[in-house]
């Protein structure tokens, strides 16, 4: 059973992007927390300004939050009791392999290999089309004693950093990961739910970004809210089909990390994926949008998701349409017409079978 009355934890958040910073801010309101940045200049700026001026400008960070650019210092901050420590990874998918290899090397030297580790990245690895848990397994294998999981859900970093309400899901096969994350974050403005469905939680977080790009394109074309609702609903079916083929549970996609995250990312004004889609629908070129500094995980992982699905024999028509528009020069309205021209089919439980 999950409980929230555990003694104070010591928490190291590795990665000072928007989401790592937001979670560090939330955790530091309850427990001693250190945020690790890759560069000394960024760590110094965070410490002096008490603000992440690059990723979360205008959001004041709690006075108790500490900063460092030294990974050894960040791990030493955890102390010597792995049962009273937690590592939160705020690095992107592309950085997962290297940071896990570092932890697999450094934690045993401190007698801290049992420290719970949870990652927060969403998406597929570009070259391999692997989900984060698959990257971890390939990097460190079943390292004796290491307990890992994923933290995900419908959340914009800025709102979490500001202390606004949010509900998240932690998924792991290890109960101590679920206990640690719940103790670290649950309470006040953050509600934490537990799951054991790691692939399902990761799939929801990955594919919702692609579907959000599609919804943005639809909105940019002024196709109306009916069209957006159709894309969200059919996108959920797409996500579920794909997830089942990777061993996920269907009911996971009706929860926070499936439907919840999809609705937020497809409709929210802070959604970068939706924003890219809006610009595409309005006629701008992808290269111009990306050159302006906008980043969107849905753009980065769309082709990897489609390739992985094809290898499993899973049909992803919306994802395929997004790839055609983003990378093959297909006009947005042409892609919409192709989706509308697909054969009629029955909706229901058979619709999501892999």
Curated annotation (Swiss-Prot):
Record field: catalytic activity: sn-glycerol 3-phosphate + NAD(+) = dihydroxyacetone phosphate + NADH + H(+); sn-glycerol 3-phosphate + NADP(+) = dihydroxyacetone phosphate + NADPH + H(+)
Q: What class of enzyme is it?
A: oxidoreductase
Into which family does the record put it? Answer: Belongs to the NAD-dependent glycerol-3-phosphate dehydrogenase family.
NCBIfam families from the UniProt entry:
PRK00094.1-2, PRK00094.1-4
Task: Tell me the keywords, alphabetical order.
Answer: Cytoplasm, Lipid biosynthesis, Lipid metabolism, NAD, NADP, Nucleotide-binding, Oxidoreductase, Phospholipid biosynthesis, Phospholipid metabolism
Q: What organism, scientifically named, is this protein from?
A: Bordetella avium (strain 197N)
* Residues binding sn-glycerol 3-phosphate: 122, 153, 155, 208, 261, 271-273
Entry function = Catalyzes the reduction of the glycolytic intermediate dihydroxyacetone phosphate (DHAP) to sn-glycerol 3-phosphate (G3P), the key precursor for phospholipid synthesis.
Q: Which residues form the active site?
A: 208 (proton acceptor)
UniProt xrefs under HAMAP family: NAD_Glyc3P_dehydrog (MF_00394)
Q: Which GO terms describe its biological process?
A: carbohydrate metabolic process; glycerol-3-phosphate biosynthetic process; glycerol-3-phosphate catabolic process; glycerophospholipid metabolic process; phospholipid biosynthetic process
Task: Identify this protein by name.
Answer: Glycerol-3-phosphate dehydrogenase [NAD(P)+]
Q: Identify the metabolic or biological route this protein is part of.
A: Membrane lipid metabolism; glycerophospholipid metabolism
Q: Which PANTHER family does this UniProt record tie to the protein?
A: GLYCEROL-3-PHOSPHATE DEHYDROGENASE (PTHR11728), GLYCEROL-3-PHOSPHATE DEHYDROGENASE [NAD(+)] 2, CHLOROPLASTIC (PTHR11728:SF1)
Classification via PROSITE patterns: NAD_G3PDH
As for subcellular location, the record says: Cytoplasm
Residues the entry annotates as binding NADPH: 18-19, 38, 122, 157, 272, 297
Give the top-rank taxon of the lineage listed in the UniProt record for this protein: Bacteria
Q: Name the Enzyme Commission number(s) assigned to this protein.
A: 1.1.1.94
Q: Which GO terms describe its cellular component?
A: cytosol
Q: Name one Pfam family in it.
A: NAD_Gly3P_dh_C
Single GO term (MF): NAD binding
């Amino acid at each position: 059973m999950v409980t929230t009355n555990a003694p104070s934890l010591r928490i190291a958040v590795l990665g000072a992007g928007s989401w790592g910073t937001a979670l560090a801010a939330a955790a530091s309101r309850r427990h001693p927390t250190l945020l690790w940045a890759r560069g000394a200049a960024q760590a110094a700026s965070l410490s002096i300004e008490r603000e992440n001026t690059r990723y979360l400008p205008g959001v004041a960070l709690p006075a108790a939050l500490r900063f460092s650019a030294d990974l050894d210092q960040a791990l030493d901050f955890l102390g010597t009791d792995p049962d009273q420590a937690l590592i939160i990874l705020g690095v992107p998918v592309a950085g997962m392999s290297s940071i896990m290899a570092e932890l697999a090397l450094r934690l045993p030297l401190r007698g801290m290999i049992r420290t719970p580790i949870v990652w927060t990245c969403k998406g597929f690895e570009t070259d391999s089309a692997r989900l984060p848990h698959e990257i971890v397994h390939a990097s460190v294998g079943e390292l004796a004693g290491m307990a890992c999981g994923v933290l995900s859900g419908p959340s914009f970093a800025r709102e979490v950093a500001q202390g606004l309400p949010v509900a998240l899901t932690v998924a792991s096969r290890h109960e101590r990961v679920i206990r640690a994350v719940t103790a670290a974050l649950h309470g006040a403005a953050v509600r934490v739910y537990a799951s054991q469905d790691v692939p399902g939680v990761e799939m929801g977080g990955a594919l919702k970004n692609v579907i959000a790009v599609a919804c943005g394109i639809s909105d940019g074309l002024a196709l109306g809210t009916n069209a957006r609702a159709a894309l969200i609903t059919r996108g959920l079916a797409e996500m579920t089909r794909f997830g089942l083929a990777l061993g996920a549970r269907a009911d996971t996609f009706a929860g926070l990390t499936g439907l919840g995250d999809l609705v937020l990312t497809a409709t929210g004004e802070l959604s970068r994926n939706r924003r890219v889609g809006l610009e595409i629908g309005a006629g701008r070129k992808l290269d111009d949008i990306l050159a302006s500094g906008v980043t969107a995980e849905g753009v980065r992982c769309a082709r990897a998701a489609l390739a992985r699905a094809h290898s499993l024999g899973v049909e992803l028509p919306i994802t395929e349409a997004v790839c055609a528009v983003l990378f093959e020069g297909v006009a947005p309205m042409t892609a919409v017409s192709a989706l509308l021209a697909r054969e009629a089919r029955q909706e229901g439980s058979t619709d999501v079978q892999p």
